[in-house]
Amino acid sequence: MPYVPHSPEEIREMLDVIGVNSVEDLFAEIPAELRPKSFNLPKGKSEMAVLQQLDKMAAKNTTDLTSFLGAGFYDHFIPTAVDALSSRSEFYTAYTPYQPESSQGTLQAIFEYQTAMARLMDMDYANASVYDGGSALYEATLMAVRKTRRRKIIVSEALNPIYRVMLDSYTTNLNLELVTVPHNHGRTNVKSITAAVDKDTAAVIVQNPNFFGSVNDFTEMFAAVHEHKALAIMSTYPVMQSVLKTPGQMGADIAVADGQSIGQPLSFGGPYLGIMTCSKALVRQMPGRIAGRTEDEDGKTGYVLTIQAREQHIRRQKATSNICSNQALCALRTLIHLCLLGEEGLNRTAVLSVERAHYAAERLTAIDGVEMFTKGPFGNEFAVTLPVNAFEVIDKLTERGIIPGFPVGRYYEGLENVLLVACTEKTTEEQIGIFAEILRGTI
């Protein structure tokens, strides 16, 4: 909307209508000690001057760096059609579709998104999304606690540390017992997790690929978890589901993910969306909205919000969660992106990303002193141990136009020399070669 300041004449007219002499008189009831003395702000500027100032500030951003950052958020290519379709006003300005008779387009889009997510994860049901991957994991944890009526949660240390911090924060006052099982050189410690499960365990939480990029098959572990009547929760990377064994195939009860990698640009932490899917037995424990397909009395297909007794606008205190909105626009972008790619396109995206990562691992470990930290199979992300501090390497390479990866030591004490490197289909062999040569000359 245009930036239109009030003229002195307009201010005078409004004050006259209100019946006060000045702006100061308007706020006279506020005690002097509570009024701001000065904000030290310059006088207001015109729209043109504001835009010029913002352009000058934006010019300080560096956008031509080659990035190998991952750690849960990935720079995949987004077709132009995603922006074009998702920015249509019918979607962009739509509100929560409480009135199905006037919201069929929005409801069908949500239904199609749910269908796509359930197929992608090989699970029975999906909701209309939550805020992000971390909140999806938290909600999955609460689902397990409600279903099992137990309070012990076993968490792999190889789970994204941002998610673990969020889980700790969200559950601080819920009297849950969070048991963290150490990783094994970047791999999820399946034996230790299985051994930790007992009659008091509500759920086991693992990630595949995990934070270090390591890939596991949890089928046997999940079977052991189920023997104790506990639930298996898996956090995933959506793009990789086309080349890996899915959560459903492994026997997961709840599968969650951050949907950023499909349709959402990297943008200072958001907005993204949390993907939530579950088995049929848990659908009534699912938080957030669920769109369903039905028929009206004339036999015409219609879409509605269903199983609403779970939601706060129906039962408030007894609701499965108090989420007041979802990320419907982000979910739409994910749906559009998936539809544009198709199964073959998504698979090709994943294969290219994995191939580039394995080529990068080969080039980097050919450098003296650089060794693989991630042991065993990995996807499009891996960790290497450097002979020097990873933070220092990142600073030096960034000055040369390359962000070499994520410093694992930020979240894992004792791993200050470990660098987490990610590749996507956008990463070229030329970029990898330049990265390797600059790194060789730096360390």
UniProtKB/Swiss-Prot annotation:
The glycine cleavage system catalyzes the degradation of glycine. The P protein binds the alpha-amino group of glycine through its pyridoxal phosphate cofactor; CO(2) is released and the remaining methylamine moiety is then transferred to the lipoamide cofactor of the H protein. It comes from Maridesulfovibrio salexigens (strain ATCC 14822 / DSM 2638 / NCIMB 8403 / VKM B-1763) (Desulfovibrio salexigens). Its EC number is 1.4.4.2. It catalyses: N(6)-[(R)-lipoyl]-L-lysyl-[glycine-cleavage complex H protein] + glycine + H(+) = N(6)-[(R)-S(8)-aminomethyldihydrolipoyl]-L-lysyl-[glycine-cleavage complex H protein] + CO2. InterPro entries: GcvPA (IPR023010), GDC-P_N (IPR049315), GDC_P (IPR020581), PyrdxlP-dep_Trfase (IPR015424), PyrdxlP-dep_Trfase_major (IPR015421), PyrdxlP-dep_Trfase_small (IPR015422). Belongs to the GcvP family. N-terminal subunit subfamily. The keyword Acyltransferase does not apply. It holds the Pfam family GDC-P. Keywords: Oxidoreductase. This is Probable glycine dehydrogenase (decarboxylating) subunit 1. One of its GO terms (molecular function) is glycine dehydrogenase (decarboxylating) activity. GO terms for biological process: glycine decarboxylation via glycine cleavage system; nucleoside metabolic process. The glycine cleavage system is composed of four proteins: P, T, L and H. In this organism, the P 'protein' is a heterodimer of two subunits.
